[in-house]
Amino acid sequence: MAYKIPFPPRQPSASSHLPLTLISLEDWALVTLNGPDRVKYLQGQVTADIEALPADSHVLCGHCDAKGKMWSNLRLFHRGEGFAYLERRSVLDSQLAEIKKYAVFSKLTIAADSEAVLLGVAGFQARAALAGVFNSLPDAEHQVVQDGETTLLHFSLPAERFLLVTTAAVAEQLVDKLHEQAELNDSQQWLTLDIEAGYPVIDAANSGQFIPQATNLQALDGISFSKGCYTGQEMVARAKFRGANKRALYWLEGKAGRVPQAAEDVELQLGENWRRTGTVLSAARLADGTLWVQVVLNNDLDADSKLRVRDDATSQLAIKPLPYSLAEEK
């Protein structure tokens, strides 16, 4: 079967209702880092402890400015003889320029990889479908597997799913093998699963706006508070040790007449009135009409708070529990 990226769009589904689905990830971009100074350089740029990152693990970390605000978050992992990371395509150019600023003084090459194909595999029996294609698959304990020219990443949240960094030839073989049993969908389905997982989505509209803790990166093991210096470290540490962070990422569910855009605010009900608050990171309307919104709000909100999409009197949004704990931040 001939394939073209992006795959034809369908309304996305929650993980509990998702059939086997092959997902094109056109809204994400891949960057590679190679060279003898790659570990040392990255260690001084991102919030995670790169020196301690095993070859079979991946991590969601922040790349911050001097004030501790994230240019982007990065899904970072080993690939080949170097590192690679995934980020939203909308922030690629600006974030890449920032992380390359001081690379001229180091022995490494940082570059966007426009040749690699990014695919997601999720839904019913995703593991069984891939088992017939690859020699070995990652799991919760060994999250990254290299199979020839393909790097496979495993995600446990919100349910087992896989991300493939591969070649056009392997992607074509995969589509050809699975297209009769799998649905095809575009990257909005992967975005929806990230919202359900509580993984913060940083697009261009929100670049440079949030410290990592405001998007729950500390709860996702994306911040090391014991590693050496990195850009923005002082502000990130102050937010933890002085309790300076007053925000958190929330998952809202409900209905609305429209899907809010990144960087919009939402409205919180206070008595008979509504007050604008927060910042939308991402949102998706599911196949059943339900609206999901990922939003940064004050971290002391009551669990039964009533919210709505801005200027939409018909909208109703409620807080859904995330699949991980923020207890250590409270």
From Swiss-Prot:
Keywords: Cytoplasm, Folate-binding, tRNA processing
One GO BP: RNA modification
GO CC list: cytoplasm
Subcellular localization: Cytoplasm
Keyword Magnesium found: no
Family annotation (InterPro entries): GcvT/YgfZ_C (IPR029043), tRNA-modifying_YgfZ (IPR023758), YgfZ/GcvT (IPR045179), YgfZ/GcvT_CS (IPR017703), YgfZ_barrel (IPR048451)
Pfam families (alphabetical): YgfZ_barrel
GO molecular function annotations of the record: folic acid binding
Main location: cytoplasm
Residues at which folate binds: W28, W190
Entry superkingdom: Bacteria
Role noted for this protein: Folate-binding protein involved in regulating the level of ATP-DnaA and in the modification of some tRNAs. It is probably a key factor in regulatory networks that act via tRNA modification, such as initiation of chromosomal replication.
HAMAP family: tRNA_modifying_YgfZ
Family: Belongs to the tRNA-modifying YgfZ family.
Protein name: tRNA-modifying protein YgfZ
Source species of the chain: Serratia proteamaculans (strain 568)
